[in-house]
Amino acid sequence: MPGIAYLGPEGTFTEAALRALDAQGLIPATQSGAGSVTPLATDSTPAALAAVRAGDADFACVPIENSIDGPVIPTLDSLADGVPLQIYAELTLDVSFTIAVRPGVTAADVRTVAAFPVAAAQVKRWLSENLPNVELVPSNSNAAAARDVADGRAEAAVSTALATERYGLDTLAAGIVDEPNARTRFVLVGCPGPPPKRTGSDRTSVVLRLDNVPGALVTAMNELAIRGIDLTGIESRPTRTELGTYRFYLDFVGHIDDDAVAGALRALHRRCADVRYLGSWPTGETGGAAPPPLDEATAWLQRLREGRP
């Protein structure tokens, strides 16, 4: 059974995403349904990806974007640095939180709240209205926050229902989130290999390093625009090697087997200082306008090559 590294300990949203990917048959070489993988808990998202690079796990399940704070920066940075990795699948979960406490603890007793920073940002308003003046204690994950409460390091935790149950805690409040329809997107990452087959509802992602010349980013974006490719996300991050130098993460609709996407990737490879391909994979839903099919001009050129003007 494939080993899948994830942000632990047991009870995180990432574990729930991993199990959902397994149940839906989205993990390569596992078509037998739930229970066909071995979850491997790690202390952080970078550690989960490092386990894949080291050969200690076949894949990693990591969060990459949420609807409140946008991209998950540790994931982006870890994908851009080190030995190349590739995304094979994605899954989006609706997210709400549980405020977990030890049995017998009331809201009046709470002075410290353990929380994963990403989770704390998503319940900031609720905490200010319902648990004002508490001290936030950073935790490595939502489940780790529950463990911190069980171990006595905080009176309450911003956690998950699963972790609350697993650590023998009580629920002070459930279904907590500042914004309705809060969602987090998770991706399955492995070593480079052939991408999943094109489905017609696909996403492709790349990381670009551009030469420091005027118009470099516009030129790169034009390679997508002129081919009718729908850019769904762009994020800049420092290279961390020299002040003022950046990498750009692009998400766009389509698959490497789409003619338009293939043409854009070839052009980006020519025009950019470096292109890291992060994969093409099924999204299971329409995330934007699909790339146009083989255009009339290309078909005309092909007829000329075949002697059929």
UniProtKB/Swiss-Prot annotation:
Its EC number is 4.2.1.51. Residues 3-191 form the Prephenate dehydratase domain. Pathway: Amino-acid biosynthesis; L-phenylalanine biosynthesis; phenylpyruvate from prephenate: step 1/1. It is an enzyme of class 4 (lyase). The keyword Transcription does not apply. It comes from Mycolicibacterium gilvum (strain PYR-GCK) (Mycobacterium gilvum (strain PYR-GCK)). Keywords: Amino-acid biosynthesis, Aromatic amino acid biosynthesis, Lyase, Phenylalanine biosynthesis. This is Prephenate dehydratase. Residues 205-282 form the ACT domain. Disulfide bonds: none annotated. GO terms for cellular component: cytoplasm. The gene is pheA.
